Amino acid sequence: CCSQDCLVCIPCCPN
């Protein structure tokens, strides 16, 4: 999830 698409995985990427 939090690897390439941070836009799609918001819960995974707080920043």
Curated annotation (Swiss-Prot):
One of its GO terms (cellular component) is extracellular region. Expressed by the venom duct. It is found in: Secreted. One of its GO terms (molecular function) is toxin activity. Keywords: Amidation, Disulfide bond, Hydroxylation, Neurotoxin, Secreted, Toxin. The keyword Secreted applies. Its main location: secreted. The keyword Nucleotide-binding does not apply. Disulfide bonds join C1-C13, C2-C9, C6-C12. The modification Asparagine amide is found at N15. The modification 4-hydroxyproline is found at P11. The cysteine framework is III (CC-C-C-CC). Belongs to the conotoxin M superfamily. Causes scratching in mice. This is Conotoxin QcIIIA.
